[in-house]
Amino acid sequence: MTQKNASSASPLSYKDAGVDIDAGDALIERIKPLAKKTMREGVLAGIGGFGALFEVPKRYKEPVLVSGTDGVGTKLKLAFEWNMHDTVGIDLVAMSVNDVLVQGAEPLFFLDYFACGKLDVDTAAAVVGGVAKGCELSGCALIGGETAEMPGMYPPGEYDLAGFCVGAVEKSKILTGVAIKPGDVVMGLASSGVHSNGFSLVRKCIERAGANAPATLDGKPFKQALMEPTRLYVKNVLAALAAHPIKALAHITGGGLLENIPRVLPEGTAAHLTKGSWPQTELFAWLQKTAGIDDFEMNRTFNNGIGMVVVIDASQAAACAATLRAAGEAVYVIGVIAARGDDAAVLVR
């Protein structure tokens, strides 16, 4: 037997191998006008170069850069199944900019990473359109990103997302929580829904409910209620920070209230939350009933209706709440800071 001469075989292009450079170029052209809408003070060079350039605004005297990175988790599985791709980009931005905000920082710029097995330009453009929308709503520039088409790495129709944010805060205004003391008030800002954590359990609940899943939750179609994008707290909370002496913020993500509030509490303090001090939505009531889990597990898995926590001196709480409500936030006084004994750092009772 003779081996076929490789030189006589048909030539192979990169496209034959599964990577379509033309599709990637087409996507970039669709992204550019979306990114342009997010441009802000400080952007020197954005999408198209080898690296994006950003100058820290001159109004900062002692700027400290704050970075954050995150993804959207298994919420993407529902996006694939339900063909709902236009809001997961907002989720991606929110997960990082809300984290950066917790340090007292203003998000400055954002980069996204979109990975897939085969690039569908329409799907990718819908996703990145959501990223641009999230950046625009946060006052954050979409300054660059990466689209990776990797044949064989992802099943057809699926992709993964990651996001990266950099913000800035005056060194003297970094929120550390060190000034928190017993008697301080704990306020909660309402979430828009499940946000981007707990979706492995959400998907199990959908599977368990099957045809018995409700048509609507909280006045929204079932799928829309579950896919509602993570709330962006940036602009409203930055305004409150400028007007009131907020001591700490906590972004309620994976681990819920029970795992995230302790991250900003100084040693020797605890947060005592009052059960029923904020409304339980139909969405979370359905998840709890369908999963058959207790309140403790709900508060450790989901945000359970509270997406951001604010800790402030009792004398300042009413004024701060009024500022946030005037900006459109639903605000609840959900607890108080106490001296910590032998109990957990967060108690809900």
From Swiss-Prot:
Q: What is its EC number?
A: 6.3.3.1
Q: Where in the cell is it found?
A: Cytoplasm
Q: Specify the domain of life of the species encoding this protein.
A: Bacteria
Q: In which pathway does it act?
A: Purine metabolism; IMP biosynthesis via de novo pathway; 5-amino-1-(5-phospho-D-ribosyl)imidazole from N(2)-formyl-N(1)-(5-phospho-D-ribosyl)glycinamide: step 2/2
Citing just one GO molecular function, the answer is: phosphoribosylamine-glycine ligase activity
Q: Name one GO cellular component term.
A: cytosol
One GO-annotated biological process of the protein: adenine biosynthetic process
Q: Which UniProt keywords apply?
A: ATP-binding, Cytoplasm, Ligase, Nucleotide-binding, Purine biosynthesis
SUPFAM superfamilies linked to this entry? PurM C-terminal domain-like (SSF56042), PurM N-terminal domain-like (SSF55326)
The name this protein carries in UniProt is Phosphoribosylformylglycinamidine cyclo-ligase
User: Lineage from the top down?
Assistant: Bacteria, Pseudomonadati, Pseudomonadota, Betaproteobacteria, Burkholderiales
In the UniProt record, the gene name given for this protein reads: purM
